[in-house]
């Protein structure tokens, strides 16, 4: 049985400091955005907005504030679906399975390389697309396999 080759979570220097940011340049999708640390609060939302290192949106400013207030050394934002859309109504009507699979690979990498605590932050937006609950269950199952706390 072959072992899955996971991507390497690498920190880079961006405006405002050292960040995790995948992909490393602005794209119409985003897998990972967060501060570097060993014990992050990993927040899972529905889909990414335009936020990037050094230019956080109000949601990510709240994630950062909550992580700091609760003693985490860092935070990482993931999303159930990685397509960037400032309005969830603009998300793909059907999921791009390649994006979904890569999103899961990056979550596996974060779980393997850090000691996270998870935070479910998808709310009722999970109902925006029929495919979102299934993708969310895939992500939750990964954390349960590794006994990651929520």
Range-by-range predicted roles:
Residues 1-57:
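Active-site and ligand/interface coordination hotspots across diverse enzymes
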Residues 27, 57-64, 96-106:
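Short acidic (Asp/Glu) patches
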Residues 40, 73-74, 149:
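Residues at the starts of beta-strands that form the adenosine-phosphate
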Residues 42-44, 76-78, 119:
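Hydrophobic/aromatic beta-strand patches that form the interior of the parallel beta-sheet core
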Residues 46, 80, 122-124:
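Short, well-ordered beta-to-alpha junction loops that form the rim of enzyme active sites
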Residues 49-71:
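A short mixed-secondary-structure module that forms the rim of ligand-binding clefts
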Residues 73-89:
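Short connector loops at secondary-structure junctions
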Residues 85, 91-150:
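Glycine/proline-rich loop-helix segments at beta-alpha junctions forming the active-site rim
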């Amino acid at each position: 049985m072959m072992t899955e080759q996971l991507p390497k979570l690498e920190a880079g220097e961006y405006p405002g400091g050292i960040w995790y940011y995948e992909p490393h340049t602005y794209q119409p999708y985003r897998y990972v955005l967060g501060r570097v640390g060993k014990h992050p609060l990993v927040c899972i939302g529905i889909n990414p907005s335009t936020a990037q290192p050094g230019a956080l949106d109000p949601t990510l400013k709240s994630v950062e504030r909550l992580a700091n207030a609760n003693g985490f050394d860092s935070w990482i934002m993931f999303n159930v679906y990685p397509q960037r859309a400032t309005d969830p109504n603009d998300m793909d009507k059907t999921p791009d399975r390649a994006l979904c699979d890569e999103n899961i690979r990056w979550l596996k990498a974060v779980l393997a390389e850090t000691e996270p605590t998870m935070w479910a932050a998808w709310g009722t937006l999970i109902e925006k697309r029929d495919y979102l609950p299934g993708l969310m269950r895939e992500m939750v199952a990964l954390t349960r396999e590794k006994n990651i706390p929520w």
